[in-house]
Amino acid sequence: MTDTLDTTAPSVTYADGQGSSDVTVAVIGAGGKMGQRVSNNLAKSSYTTLYSEASPAGVELIESLGRSVTPTDEAVAAADVVILAVPDVVLGTVSEQVVPAMKSGAVILTLDPAAAYAGLLADRDDIHYAVAHPCHPSVFLERTTKEEWADTFGGVAAPQEV
């Protein structure tokens, strides 16, 4: 996995009506608890968003919101950013299916830092990996000291809003 900043990765802005329609985001697990939260925020942005869901109940929910469901393989192949909003226990398996189908230079974002830390994600040198959990916004806040930057798992050094 790469851990350096690559300025060629798609630019990402806040989901407050901003964003670029040139950036396509795929939400895998869009009908689940976390997928709904992520999808609802992306729906407020200008990003092209593709919603993928395996469960019939999740598909029904997505469609009830007026959103179309895209098959996972199609969503992943088209996406600049792939968000894995799936249960932690299947994250490794889903990443093994998704990562090989991603575009070179795309970003994969998981909502579980433990899976990445444990090396459970499929590895590919030509994509970028990121982790951000909606309940742990400290990774998005300004950090100034070396200790704050090193504290990405919710310890005491990083600023906390939760």
Located regions from the model:
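Short acidic low-complexity segments
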Residues: G66-A79
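N-terminal Rossmann-fold NAD(P) dinucleotide-binding loop
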Residues: G35-Q36
